[in-house]
């Protein structure tokens, strides 16, 4: 009995130590923080990333490359193909609402493959601390092909780097709950699906974007200029819109716009020569 008590005590101590060592999210702690000023600039995806900045490249559909100053490469909604450039990402994230958001056969050379789902209905919890970047997720529900609901089947991934809080809403099928908003914390930059049908209706997506109050909103999951233009036509006067034809931008805390800005990026696969 004494041995059993000692064993339990050791487990509790180890759990407490793990909780103490787990890096806290500054995006939650600073959810009421004030964003920076100035603006952001275009760049090639292969350019060195400026100090205290993150490069964002729109690859395709819901897939983005995030690159840090130290050369850490993360690809969202990874399908197994990013382009002709021989890139092995350090991290890929995936959601499984449709095959255009994941692959069952990621390259085994990728060090970290983060699936946005777990056992059916159970969800999954990610908290990957890579030093330069902390990656975590907030689970939401998705509809399945049979008209039912898979609880916690989608992940909103949050990437914390260079003092920024960058969110990818994934295949969002419902307005987040107050608890989910609280778990997200502050999002300076957010990638949001704007198709208006397969994911959230536009009215609900605009509600979500209004609640998040992100400085930079990057539309994704638009299937044509028609669906993109339909979304842009619904944007209220509180948003600025930038559409300069670029696929890549670099953003930092000091370069966030003073007004909420829809920044349209044009999807382009990664090429070795750009």
Language-model features: where?
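Bacterial N-terminal signal peptides
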Residues: 5-15
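Residue-level signal for inorganic ion chemistry
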Residues: 217
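Metallo-beta-lactamase
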Residues: 17-143, 164-169, 188-192, 225, ...
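Active-site-proximal loop/helix segments of hydrolase catalytic cores
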Residues: 142-212, 223-229
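Short, flexible, glycine/charge-rich loop motifs used to bind or transfer phosphoryl groups or to couple energy/partner
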Residues: 64, 80-84, 156, 179-181, ...
């Amino acid at each position: 009995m004494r041995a059993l008590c000692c064993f339990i005590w050791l487990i509790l101590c180890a759990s407490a130590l793990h909780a103490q060592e787990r890096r806290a999210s500054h995006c939650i702690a600073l959810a009421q923080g004030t964003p920076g000023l100035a603006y952001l600039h275009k760049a090639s995806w292969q350019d060195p990333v400026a100090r205290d900045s993150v490069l964002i490249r729109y690859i395709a559909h819901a897939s983005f490359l995030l690159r840090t100053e130290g050369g850490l490469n993360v690809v969202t909604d990874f399908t197994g193909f990013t382009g002709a450039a021989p890139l092995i990402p350090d991290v890929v994230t995936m959601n499984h609402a449709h095959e255009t958001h994941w692959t069952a056969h990621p390259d085994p050379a990728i060090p970290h493959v983060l699936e946005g789902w777990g056992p059916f209905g159970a969800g999954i919890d990610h908290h990957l601390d890579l030093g330069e970047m902390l990656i975590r997720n907030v689970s939401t529900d998705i509809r399945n092909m049979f008209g039912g609901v898979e609880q916690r089947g989608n992940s909103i991934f949050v990437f914390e780097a260079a003092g920024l809080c960058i969110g990818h809403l994934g295949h969002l099928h419902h307005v987040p709950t107050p608890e989910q908003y609280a778990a997200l914390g502050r999002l300076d930059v957010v990638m949001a699906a704007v198709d208006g049908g397969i994911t959230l209706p536009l009215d609900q997506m605009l509600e979500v974007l209004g609640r998040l109050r992100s400085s930079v909103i990057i539309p994704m999951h638009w299937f044509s200029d028609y669906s993109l233009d339909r979304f842009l036509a619904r944007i209220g006067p509180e948003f600025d819109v930038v559409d300069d034809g670029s696929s890549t931008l670099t953003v930092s805390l000091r370069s966030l716009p003073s007004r909420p800005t829809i920044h349209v990026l044009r999807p382009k696969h990664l090429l070795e020569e750009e």
